[in-house]
Amino acid sequence: MMINIQEDKLVSAHDAEEFLRFFNSGDEALQQEATTLLTREAHLLDIQAYRAWLEHCVDSEVKYQIISRELRSASERRYQLNETMNIFNENYEQLEVRVAHQLDPQNWGNSPKVRFTRFITNIQAAMDENEDLLHIRSNLIVHRARRGNQVDVFYATREDKWKRGEDGARKLVQRLIDYPERTFQTHNVMIFM
């Protein structure tokens, strides 16, 4: 199956390429491995075991990026600018700083304790042709509750790359989170997606 981006003008070249990658992959074992990786990772993040998440799920060479795409119609665009904007563009050291901040007893944002629930859906998995990289695309909903009246819900699409290490375990080497809002409707974005 092919997507003709000349005819389907709303489909970007990147999206067409990613669709084709996952459409041609029919490996059930790979799909199960991807689902297991993501649900274990979500569990660690839900219970706020951030150091364990860094140690067991995240590679030291990780690129962790949250972007927002242009949401205006083509007729409203007056200038040729990037259609994406970085919200976060972090490496392992920066993730370590964020984890340390979350675990700091002085962090007022965690008193009272914040509760998280993550829903990961539409998981698709495919192997990279040239490398031992597992590509995983998924949709994510994060529900964050603090006190009775502070509830935030985040929706996003994630494109991950997981690499198998020397110990045989896969770790996250790249995560691109496509956040569909240009302006956050939440108190803050101090979460890991």
From Swiss-Prot:
Coiled coil: none annotated. SUPFAM superfamilies: NTF2-like. CDD domains: ring_hydroxylating_dioxygenases_beta. Pfam families: Ring_hydroxyl_B. Pathway: Aromatic compound metabolism; naphthalene degradation. The naphthalene dioxygenase (NDO) multicomponent enzyme system is composed of an electron transfer component and a dioxygenase component (iron sulfur protein (ISP)). The electron transfer component is composed of a ferredoxin reductase (NdoR) and a ferredoxin (NdoA), and the dioxygenase component is formed of a heterohexamer (trimer of heterodimers) of three large alpha subunits (NdoB) and three small beta subunits (NdoC). Belongs to the bacterial ring-hydroxylating dioxygenase beta subunit family. Component of the naphthalene dioxygenase (NDO) multicomponent enzyme system which catalyzes the incorporation of both atoms of molecular oxygen into naphthalene to form cis-(1R,2S)-dihydroxy-1,2-dihydronaphthalene. The beta subunit seems to have a structural role in the holoenzyme. This is Naphthalene 1,2-dioxygenase system, small oxygenase component. It comes from Pseudomonas aeruginosa.
